[in-house]
Amino acid sequence: MSSLTRRDFVRSAALAALATQLPRAVSAANIPTTAANATPEASGAVGPTVRWLDGAPPAVQSGVTWGMPWPRGKNTKQTTFSLRDGATEIPVQSWPLAFWPDGSLKWTAHAVPAGQVPAADSLVEAGTPRAPATPLVVRETGDSIEVDTGVIVARLARAGAVIVTSVRRGEQEILRGGRLVALRQGTPDTAAEPELQAGEIATVTVEQPGPVRAVVKIEGRHASATDGRRWLPFVVRLYFYAGGEAIRVMHTFVHDGDERKESIRGIGLRFDVPLRGELHDRHIRFSGEGNGLFGEAVRTVTGLRRDAGAAVRAAQIAGEATPPVASWDPRAGKRMHLVPAFADWSLFQSSADGFEIRKRTAEGCSWLTAARGQRAGGLGYVGTPKGGVAFGVRNFWQSYPGELAIAGATSDVAGVTAWLWSPRSGAMDLRGYRDGAEMGTYAEQLEGLEITYEDYEPGFDRPEGVARTSELFIWALAATPSRAHLAQLAEVVRTPPVVVTTPEYLHSCDVFGGLWAPADRSNSARAAIEDRLDWAFRFYEGQREERRWYGFWNFGDVMHTYDADRHEWRYDVGGFAWDNSELSTDIWLWLHFLRTGRAEVFRFAEAMTRHTGEVDVHHLGRFAPLGSRHNVLHWGCSAKQLRISTATNRRYYYYLTGDERVGDLLHEQVEAVRALATVQANRKVAPDRVTAPDPNAKEVYAGFGTDWGSAAAAWLTEWERTGDPKMRDRLLASMRTIGAQPRGFFTGGGRLELATGAFALAANDRVTVSHLSAVFGLVEVCAELVQLLDEPAFRSAWLDYCTLYNAPAAEQRQRLGEALRGNNLRQAHSRLTAFAARTNGDAALARRAWREFIEGERGDSGLSRPPESRRVNGPDVLRPVDEAAWVSTNGTAQWGLAAIECLALVGESIPEDVR
């Protein structure tokens, strides 16, 4: 089998042929060679090497996947890849993620088996891949799927309520009955006992069958055994690697209930572990903070009045088989049946600052508190010297309230539940935070917007269709591991190993539009900007910790605006609370990672991508697949928008990792613009222009900024991934008709034909401009489109917009017939000026871009204000915090993007003293 084979990529087989049908595609010769798009040879950049994100190789490597970019034209669709660590060939499986317009590979994904640890500077290159010593094998039958990694064999069901029928090592069954569970109850105020529901399989798809990596996708809904109700759709992916004993689980559920009548009391993954041997040889483990580990036996032999012997105690503490009872001191051995054995165990993380471990002997008996701590590592284990299961939930304490529960450890089979939301915390309360009785009319809602910045509307603050994705790990082990090894597994759960390439190589491939370049401190002016970029990231990293921006529905997001009087972010004030990707926070973080390669930046951006792509977007229901504007509740605003769900925010993570769930989210946005026919943004401010919602509409009004920019990002990504000519044609039609408008981008928007992507031409030459049009990813997607598709009128229209938005009023009047009004965020738009300067080779325009960037609009926007915070202590605040009252997330994200892109585009023109 070719190393590039992948079932869901079969339809891309015709891509090379399609490339010949792109007469308007830009050729390499038509692209000016700049620092942003030079080849590796021209720039002296390093080749396609890989490195471990955290620097050092991991102690445990259970299988890893990463993405690699390639220069245009370097590798064909038929290219296979090898991975070489010096003279050593490492087994690797490869597949395509995206293609350049000429059909050559733009991004590929690569996977290596468990136990293989490529050294830094290992080289990915064209060649015949080495096969794994024991290739992973997937066997499919009518009712099951079997995945054999060479170490474990997992049998998966195609129907029913059990997903993982069994996992075996050799002849021994280690795990059985893997299933999804949910608890449903009435409103959070209801005292009734919740109903247990099981996840029922609808479809199972083998997305990847090896030989290094297998991916199995399971979809279905949670079902009630009493009334037959099916709710909470789920998508679960199971990942296996050759030579591995682990299963990685990506668990997604979508909320489709009525939060006013019912609520989720718990949701998680449950499985059974057969136990063999004496109760004193059964071991329980939970990870704490750092390398801390709680470890006990179901029945202890330590601390007793009669000592069984030093060898017995040492073996139990180490998790090894104890000597035969007949060899113990008989005063202890003959009385062991009188020592209480503990059947049920629990690690419960109730908040970001506290966890509790407890145990009990049986149902109906009291729980004993065994330990307490602050932030658990999220790993548990139950087993014996003859086999057991380690299991963990990533971001365990950050995503509280979670629980790892073990039941029946005194029986032949222990039950394990990894609660992603623990029932001990009470039910999820997803109801609106206000009744809105005083805001029933549009006029009242607009008045509310004036005071709280909240765009409230009854019925629009519901969580219908919001989703949550969690990452879990399961290890089927031959015996209870040492404490040191369990601490290593806990580290995998906490920070899974990640492989990346270097910023220099990424940059040399000219991906992501050439709008960024590796961090450069070669002179004092550049260093000053780099210092400010680093400070901004560190400040938000610190605020997440100090302000406790954690929790199941919150982790990954940041707050929007600060309240200096309360010394608190405005968590309870309408549109000033959660940020929800406003003004491209995600893009700022990802570009900061691309240019620095720093692990802490990657993981901050990764958490935000998971959150904003799942929680801040409606994946089903009346608002799907639109995102929701910033609000006290992530889904609370009535402004449902493409600019929040935009594929631009997800592209970076997808291409860097090949993550299939994020791939789903990208595909989900392909037809998102159709939602504008039923959720009309201007219904409150221009009710006379609103038409009746029509799900079968053939056209919609779309702005050229946040609307079309988001649609274009989705079409571009789908075209790159699949080669679908319909996506290319939509892009070309929309670009061509934007370029043909009387005022180009300054026309503002138009009627978009949904089938073709073409805009109707405006009947007048009125100038329309919004300061928000270009700050939700439009700059980034247009840079790629100009690079990829040769549409001269579009290119000209975009360069006009970039040049004139911040131009002097006299120049605007000369070119447009009037001076622009409402063109705020001038500092943020300095990067548009820089793009025009670079593209046109205009030195004067480059100098103007730096003036716009440095001066800003207010004194606190430029570098003139030192990036400082002050410590605020009690009794002014609940606990000490660092405060920078002048900081806003909008300003930080846009300043960061302007800094990064101006440095990349016109860095050679930077003034010596940017202060």
Where are these regions (language model features)?
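N-terminal export signals
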Residues: 2, 8-29
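Surface-exposed beta-strand/loop patches in extracellular or lumenal glycoproteins
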Residues: 54-77, 264-272
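Solvent-exposed beta-strand/loop surfaces of large extracellular or lumenal domains
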Residues: 84-107, 440-451
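Beta-strand/loop-rich accessory regions of lumenal/periplasmic or secreted enzymes
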Residues: 110, 144-501, 555-561, 577-580, ...
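Terminal, non-catalytic domain-edge segments
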Residues: 481-492, 717-744, 748-915
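Catalytic cores of eukaryotic secretory-pathway lumenal/extracellular enzymes that build
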Residues: 540-580, 612-727, 739-771, 775
